[in-house]
UniProtKB/Swiss-Prot annotation:
HAMAP family: MurB. This is UDP-N-acetylenolpyruvoylglucosamine reductase. It is an enzyme of class 1 (oxidoreductase). The lineage of its organism: Bacteria, Thermotogati, Thermotogota, Thermotogae, Thermotogales. Pathway: Cell wall biogenesis; peptidoglycan biosynthesis. Belongs to the MurB family. It is found in: Cytoplasm. Cell wall formation. NCBIfam families: murB, PRK13905.1.
Length: 309
């Protein structure tokens, strides 16, 4: 006899068995805190990890067919889930991590960590990701938000993205992806799910690439609070000449806390979980910073992180 795991998601035993047959690892009533860098957030009724791209597509097809709401997660580095139980299924791309190198091109699955992608480039003496080394998150997440750092953006090296639109597998060229500052078509077209990405690099000297990557990591450790759970830079830059971290620091807010959430003492653009933080603490701190920046600079800040409700 079928039972309901959660009335709001209509997940029956039959659906669970079908997902299992698709090759998914399934975790019931799973804590999202175990899957996001912030180490906080509520439970979801089901957390599914397909073991292949085909299994992933079958999973999405089934959830769509059954009318079950879902979210996609990569490495969880840019997500802030609220504290309350969330009513949707979460599907992970983490095992969609295939890599294929063809001369100066690298095709990878959306779930591959960007750090591993950088190491693949290094191993194959390909230059272009030196400033991206240590970028947290998955390839899919980087493409989704056009992640960037130290003057580099994901869009620079993208050639093509393979996506699933809920019916068909489609290919999008660079000019069709709608890249902008921390955005892409995938943010507005929620039915489009990134499966693979192809990057174009150029041949370089392995030692030079390695040394530049080390320099990038050194800068990260010196300037970012990597020793604490966080979701990276919290706010988008509202305009090219407005540095959010500098503005927050000018307000004397470095080290300011609400509950377990704190504005980093190392970089004011980061909010960290200094221990026992709730999502509510982080959200209150975000609003506090927005208010203070608005009062002093007449600038409206937007969050770079994704807030899951």
């Amino acid at each position: 006899m079928d039972y309901m795991l959660n009335i709001s998601t209509n997940i029956t035993r039959k659906i669970l068995e079908t997902l299992w047959n698709y090759g998914c690892d399934l975790f019931l009533n799973e804590e999202l805190a175990d899957h996001v860098n912030f180490k906080l957030g509520g439970k979801v009724p089901l957390f599914a990890i397909p073991n292949s791209t085909n299994g992933f597509i079958e999973t999405i097809n089934l959830l769509n067919k059954e009318g079950i709401e879902f979210r996609i997660i990569g490495r969880g580095t840019n997500i802030l889930p609220v504290d309350e139980p969330l009513p949707y299924v979460v599907v992970s791309t983490e095992r969609m991590d295939d890599v294929f190198v063809d001369n100066e091109k690298i095709q990878v699955g959306a779930g591959l960590s960007f750090k591993k992608l950088c190491l693949v480039a290094l191993e194959n003496e390909l230059s272009g990701f030196e400033n991206a080394f240590g970028l947290p998150g998955s390839v899919g997440g980087a493409v989704y938000m056009n992640a960037g750092c130290y003057g580099w953006e994901t869009a620079e090296n993208i050639v093509e993205v393979v996506a699933f639109d809920g019916k068909d597998i489609i290919k999008l060229g660079k000019n069709e992806i709608g890249f902008g500052y921390r955005t892409s078509i995938f943010k507005s077209e929620k039915n489009l799910i990134i499966l693979q990405a192809t990057f174009k690099l150029k041949k370089g000297n392995k030692n030079e690439i390695y040394n530049l990557m080390l320099e990038t990591m050194k800068k990260r450790y010196e300037k970012q609070p990597l020793e604490f759970p966080s979701a990276g830079s919290v706010f988008k830059r509202p305009r090219p000449d407005f540095y959010v971290g500098t503005a927050i620091e000018s307000l004397g807010l470095k080290g300011f806390s609400i509950g377990g959430a704190q504005i980093s003492e190392k970089h004011a653009g980061f909010i960290i979980n200094k221990g026992g933080a709730k999502a509510e603490d982080v959200l209150k701190l975000i609003e506090y910073v927005k208010d203070k920046v608005r009062e002093k600079y007449n600038v409206e800040l937007e969050t770079e992180i994704e807030i899951w409700k």
